[in-house]
């Protein structure tokens, strides 16, 4: 129930052998390299070692990665693959390329060879496609500008500067046109003509295209003034004919460009199909080599050696030592020691049984344990599954969840580790829900009663009815009677069970916290933070047990009262130590906090009722519609059932997941768990497209 024990690995390696060592460690993936740059700032270490930097070959590798990435981006842009529902629901594992390289130079040579071959085939079409795209973009912009001038029939070749006059085109906001004409006439001393076309909308503004003609000697004044009126100038050059003729010519050019583009794209698609897998493998190999080269920057070095430090799980320590020594052909000194750093700096690796391991993701969602802290995953699993089943509590919903979980686990989980874990968790949660659904007689709520007149909860097939009386629990046959309290229906029984389970759940957390404090030598904290609450819960069980045995209520209440007072005094003492009298007074309120934690487990009943109640409402509504509307009512009723139960399943399934986690994260973990550990991050070659 604790993270894997770690060892500190320290090694001095001959510089000629460092590449072999790094490659071996990277492939094996059992150590986490330590960055020594901060340590080497220390004066004592500075005299022994100097900081290392990334390997020289990293620059070359990075350049090749950029080139490969650019081609992959181009392949991706031209061959946008359509993903079918079948591909999403049943993804195929990636076919990996087998590779065998013994040095970075071999990888670089291979990458250069492949990239050169691809470039010979791809560069020409890709460059031409880029040219066409640029030309198309310019033509589309030109087309837009000329289209605004369509009502002004003049030869566009005259736009620009002539021997004596300048002709310009553009657009201005409609409301400024009148003022513009007046002001330009002033600054041009009347030597200007302005012609306007049909208005159009652009950027939510009504604009008007204009063409103006002025003497060249007046142009500077005109341009200076026209800018004040939000004038948007049209850059139309090397175009002949009227706007209509020019637009027709542009359309022809665009069609020709599109035809050539399509031909080039088809050619590049074929090249993508031919080279993409190979290129993805190349990119991955280069990424791996870059990671290896960058790792050098974490080392220390002398003239002829490298010094490395790493974290390694204790179970793999000897394996890592042998790996380094063998890779260095014996030219290495390796030392394995116990950690001497604060626990916050020691990486955490969780190690649970296979059936529990997927649930580690739920622990990580909260926080990883510190190195010397308890791993709560094993404690979380039974509570999470039990609470989930109680909250969703419908056998049909549970069966559906199990099927969905199995599908995610076995299908999508083949290509996604996260989906694999989630699918496994949902499968077990679904099984738990089926069991709880059978216990409570929940089969799409009261579907069997509403449509077939068969009330499962009134038969021996169901132990308890969340919405009322059942065969086993009713007015004539109460679950139990304690003083004036008589449990004669399902909701009351489930509430009592929820509080009981909550007390047990908290008790387990308190025992773990007590044990941890004792182990650390914090006896005072163990008693104040956990011990008094353990005694209080036990006193509640003893008091209730005595009442069941027929003891006087005053005696049972007195026993519980004694430990309530003890808990208040302990909380006040704790508050006084931390902040004086005021904190002591506030500390007395911890008892109400404890009560709040216990009552929080009543949410088990709340979600149980929500699931069953909403399912019942859907069934009643569907039945009423089906019976009151001839023929079509049956179809509508089926739609109501499908939509209503789907909504209920999704919403309460999600709610059960969230609230089950909340009971652990807030109520349970707060009794013993702090978290805040640093995840073990192995120096490992991540291979998706290749296998060594």
From Swiss-Prot:
Annotated thermal dependence:
Optimum temperature is 80 degrees Celsius.
Q: Which family does it belong to?
A: Belongs to the V-ATPase 116 kDa subunit family.
Entry's free-text remark on domains: Purified ATP synthase is 25.9 nm long. The hydrophilic A1 domain is 9.4 X 11.5 nm, the central stalk is 8.0 X 3.9 nm and the membrane-bound A0 domain is 6.4 X 10.6 nm; the domains are connected by two stalks. ATP is synthesized or hydrolyzed by the A1 domain while ion translocation occurs via the A0 domain.
Q: Per its record, what are the GO molecular function terms?
A: ATPase binding; proton-transporting ATPase activity, rotational mechanism
Pfam families noted in UniProt: V_ATPase_I
Subunit composition?
The A-type ATPase is composed of subunits A(3), B(3), C, D, E(1 or 2), F, H(2), I and K(x).
* Activity response to pH changes: Optimum pH is 6.0 for ATP hydrolysis.
InterPro entries on file: V-ATPase_116kDa_su (IPR002490)
Membrane spanning segments where? 389-409, 422-442, 494-514, 531-551, 553-573, 602-622, 624-644
Q: Could you tell me where this protein is found in the cell?
A: Cell membrane
List the GO cellular component terms: plasma membrane; proton-transporting V-type ATPase, V0 domain; vacuolar proton-transporting V-type ATPase complex
Please name the GO terms of the biological process aspect recorded for this protein, alphabetically.
vacuolar acidification
Provide the alphabetized UniProt keywords. Answer: Cell membrane, Hydrogen ion transport, Ion transport, Membrane, Transmembrane, Transmembrane helix, Transport
Q: What is this protein called?
A: A-type ATP synthase subunit I
This protein's species is Methanocaldococcus jannaschii (strain ATCC 43067 / DSM 2661 / JAL-1 / JCM 10045 / NBRC 100440) (Methanococcus jannaschii)
UniProt membrane topology term: Multi-pass membrane protein
Task: Explain the purpose of this protein.
Answer: Component of the A-type ATP synthase that produces ATP from ADP in the presence of a proton gradient across the membrane.
Q: List the disulfide bonds.
A: none
């Amino acid at each position: 129930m604790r993270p894997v024990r770690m060892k500190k690995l320290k090694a001095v390696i001959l510089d000629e052998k460092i590449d072999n060592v790094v490659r071996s460690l990277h492939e094996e993936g059992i150590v986490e390299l330590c960055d020594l740059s901060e340590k080497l700032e220390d004066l004592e270490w500075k005299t022994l070692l100097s900081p290392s930097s990334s390997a020289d070959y990293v620059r070359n590798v990075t350049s090749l990665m950029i080139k490969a990435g650019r081609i992959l981006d181009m392949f991706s842009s031209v061959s946008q693959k359509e993903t079918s529902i079948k591909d999403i629901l049943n993804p195929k594992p990636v076919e990996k390329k087998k590779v065998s390289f013994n040095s970075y130079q071999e990888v670089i040579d291979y990458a250069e060879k492949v990239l050169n071959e691809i470039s010979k085939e791809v560069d020409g079409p890709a460059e031409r496609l880029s040219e066409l795209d640029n030309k198309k973009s310019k033509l589309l912009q030109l087309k837009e500008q000329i289209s605004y001038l369509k009502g002004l029939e003049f030869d566009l070749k005259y736009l620009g500067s002539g021997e004596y006059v300048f002709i310009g085109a553009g657009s201005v906001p409609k409301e400024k046109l009148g003022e513009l004409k007046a002001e330009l006439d002033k600054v041009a001393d009347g030597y200007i003509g302005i012609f306007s076309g049909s208005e159009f909308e652009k950027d939510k503004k009504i604009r008007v295209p204009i063409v103006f003609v002025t003497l060249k000697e007046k142009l500077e004044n005109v341009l200076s003034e026209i800018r004040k009126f939000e004038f948007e100038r049209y850059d139309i050059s090397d175009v002949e004919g009227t706007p209509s003729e020019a637009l027709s010519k542009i359309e022809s050019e665009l069609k020709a460009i599109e035809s050539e583009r399509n031909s080039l794209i088809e050619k590049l698609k074929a090249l993508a199909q031919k080279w993409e897998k190979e290129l993805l493998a190349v990119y991955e190999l280069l990424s791996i080599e870059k990671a290896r080269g960058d790792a050098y920057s974490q080392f220390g070095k002398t003239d002829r050696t490298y010094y490395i430090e790493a974290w390694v799980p204790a179970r793999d320590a000897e394996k890592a030592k042998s790996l380094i020594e063998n890779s260095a052909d014996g030219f290495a000194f390796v030392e394995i020691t116990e950690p001497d750093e604060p626990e916050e700096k020691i990486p955490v690796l969780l190690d649970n049984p296979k059936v529990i391991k997927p649930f580690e993701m739920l622990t990580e969602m909260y926080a990883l344990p510190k190195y010397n802290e308890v791993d709560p995953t094993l404690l979380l699993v039974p509570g999470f599954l039990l609470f989930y089943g109680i909250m969703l509590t419908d056998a049909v919903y549970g069966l559906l969840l199990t099927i969905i979980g199995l599908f995610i686990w076995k299908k999508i989980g083949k290509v996604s580790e996260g989906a694999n874990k989630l699918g496994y968790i949902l499968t077990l949660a679904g099984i738990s829900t089926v069991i709880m659904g059978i216990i409570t007689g929940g089969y799409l709520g009261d579907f069997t009663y509403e449509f077939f007149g068969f009330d499962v909860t009134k038969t021996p097939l169901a132990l308890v009815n969340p919405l009322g009386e059942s065969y086993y629990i009713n007015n004539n046959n109460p679950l139990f009677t304690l003083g004036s309290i008589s449990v004669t229906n399902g909701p009351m029984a489930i509430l009592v069970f929820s509080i009981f389970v909550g007390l047990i759940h908290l008790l387990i957390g308190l025992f773990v916290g007590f044990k941890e404090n004792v182990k650390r030598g914090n006896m005072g904290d163990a008693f104040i933070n956990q011990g008094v609450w353990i005694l209080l819960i036990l006193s509640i069980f003893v008091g209730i047990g005595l009442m069941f045995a027929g003891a006087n209520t005053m005696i049972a209440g007195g026993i519980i009262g004694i430990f309530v007072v003890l808990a208040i005094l302990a909380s006040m003492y704790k508050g006084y130590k931390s902040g004086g009298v005021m904190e002591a007074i506030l500390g007395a309120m911890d008892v109400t906090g404890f009560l709040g934690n216990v009552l929080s487990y009543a949410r088990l009943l709340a979600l149980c009722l929500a699931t069953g109640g909403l399912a019942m409402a859907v069934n009643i509504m569907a039945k009423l519609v089906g019976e009151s509307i001839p023929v079509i009512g049956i179809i509508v009723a089926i739609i109501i059932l499908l939509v209503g139960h789907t909504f209920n399943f999704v919403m309460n399934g999600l709610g059960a997941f969230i609230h089950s986690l909340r009971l652990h994260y807030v109520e349970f973990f707060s009794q013993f768990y702090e978290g805040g550990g640093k995840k073990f991050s192995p120096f490992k070659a991540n291979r998706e497209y290749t296998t060594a």
